[in-house]
Amino acid sequence: MKEFSPVLHTAALFSGISDDELAVMLSYLGARIDTFPKGSRLLRAGEQVEEVGLVLAGSTLIVQEDIWGNRNILSKTGPGQTFAEVFACAPGAVLNVSVEAESAVTVMFLHIRRVLSVCPSACSHHSRIIRNLLDELAEKNLRLNEKLTHMAQRTTRAKLMSYFSAEAQRRSVYEFDIPFSRQQLADYLGVERSGLSVELGKMRDEGLLDFHKSHFLLKTPETDRPFPSAR
């Protein structure tokens, strides 16, 4: 457990929690650690879950698949980030997504529903984790709304521009790395990979952006100036 202390201390779920309080809460939440090889499924659609997953090492993809196998990537989680919070907090909820190991991954599972009950001791760290959990759920809801905005665009180019604009605005820079491969980005935006690659090439030829693998530079009349929100 000690080897993962740096990750636990930076995890949003445990923000503002001291070392002693963290040890108490991990015990209270029945923390357990498991490892999964690349490509394996940690959770499958149709299952019920009672635990939140907190990634300690590696990364996971949250995906939806229809009965024909068409994939839609909803999000990606890395060290310090959580998954399955909503389903773990809602009694009887059935997963409509699967969680895949994008790489070899180590995950801590927590019985998060225990923290939703009233603590007899009125512990401040108990309340703090509830607030942190609500913050995480709100942040993920905002990200999901962003994704819906991207997918609502009519063309592949419009979806790409919506996605890149949101990333630039979030980071307040025109140059950044994205967390997806080409296939993953296509699955995230709901387009064909071949069409996405062609459109990226056209946008580069037209001087709208430049890229190398997952590194992108957006080119606008403002690119050589400070990002608008940073002025």
Kindly label every feature range from the protein language model:
Residues 28-29, 47-49:
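Short, small/polar residue-rich loop motifs at catalytic or cofactor-binding pockets
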Residues 41-47:
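Short phosphate-coordinating micro-motif centered on Lys-Gly-acidic
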Residues 1-38, 87-90:
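Cyclic nucleotide-binding regulatory module and flanking cytosolic helices
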Residues 39, 50-63, 78-80:
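Glycine- and acidic-residue-biased ligand/ion/polar-headgroup-sensing regions
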Residues 73-131:
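Cyclic-nucleotide recognition modules
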Residues 154-159, 163-231:
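Phosphate-/nucleic-acid-contacting segments
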